[in-house]
Amino acid sequence: MAETIRIIGIDPGLRRTGWGVIDFSGNRLQFVAAGTLTSDARCDLASRLCQLYKGLTDILHQFMPQEAAVEHVFVNKDATATLKLGQARAIALLAPAQANLPVFEYAPNKVKKSVIGVGHGDKEQIHMMVKVLLPRAEFDSSDAADALALALCHSTHRIGASYHARIMA
């Protein structure tokens, strides 16, 4: 019988950070939980980052994942927005790393290709395939659905990723 691995996917954002937890065993996938963390826009940046960090650490303690998958940041024309996203992403990398989880990063196109078969699909296609692959999945936002897609992507790439990590060590 295959070992069950619990994976958390994290879709970082300063306003909304999606998270999704799945169990993966052999070729079996099971939805565990998903949700969205929000930070209070009335607070300063440091306080908002603390809110996200506390929320993520609480989720990590509650669901006890063994591996984490985080979306790789993209750069857009708005430098300020890109910087804020990068800071939220740092929290998404830090929280599981401090919990001693291996953290893997995936570009949005790789996630889409893993979940829907093409690298340039839209949000609706991703949400539909998340529901197909995880029929019991419930998510409160597109950020949570994207986080589940990250966890699914990692479940398909984890053997190669862990092998690559051992080679690089």
Swiss-Prot record:
Cofactor note (record): Binds 2 Mg(2+) ion per subunit.
Cofactor field: Mg(2+)
Single annotated GO MF: magnesium ion binding
Binding site for Mg(2+) 2: E71
Enzyme class label: hydrolase
Chain sites annotated for binding Mg(2+) 1: D11, D143
Active site: D11, E71, D143
GO biological process, one term: DNA recombination
Subcellular location: Cytoplasm
Pfam families per the UniProt record, alphabetical: RuvC (PF02075)
GO cellular component, one term: cytoplasm
Keywords from the UniProt entry: Cytoplasm, DNA damage, DNA recombination, DNA repair, DNA-binding, Endonuclease, Hydrolase, Magnesium, Metal-binding, Nuclease
Gene3D superfamilies: Ribonuclease H-like superfamily/Ribonuclease H
E.C. number: 3.1.21.10
Reactions catalysed, as given in the entry: Endonucleolytic cleavage at a junction such as a reciprocal single-stranded crossover between two homologous DNA duplexes (Holliday junction)
Entry keyword DNA repair: yes
CDD domains membership: RuvC (cd16962)
Family: Belongs to the RuvC family.
Function: The RuvA-RuvB-RuvC complex processes Holliday junction (HJ) DNA during genetic recombination and DNA repair. Endonuclease that resolves HJ intermediates. Cleaves cruciform DNA by making single-stranded nicks across the HJ at symmetrical positions within the homologous arms, yielding a 5'-phosphate and a 3'-hydroxyl group; requires a central core of homology in the junction. The consensus cleavage sequence is 5'-(A/T)TT(C/G)-3'. Cleavage occurs on the 3'-side of the TT dinucleotide at the point of strand exchange.
HAMAP family with a match to the protein in the record: RuvC (MF_00034)
Subunit and interaction comment: Homodimer which binds Holliday junction (HJ) DNA. The HJ becomes 2-fold symmetrical on binding to RuvC with unstacked arms; it has a different conformation from HJ DNA in complex with RuvA. In the full resolvosome a probable DNA-RuvA(4)-RuvB(12)-RuvC(2) complex forms which resolves the HJ.
Protein name (record): Crossover junction endodeoxyribonuclease RuvC
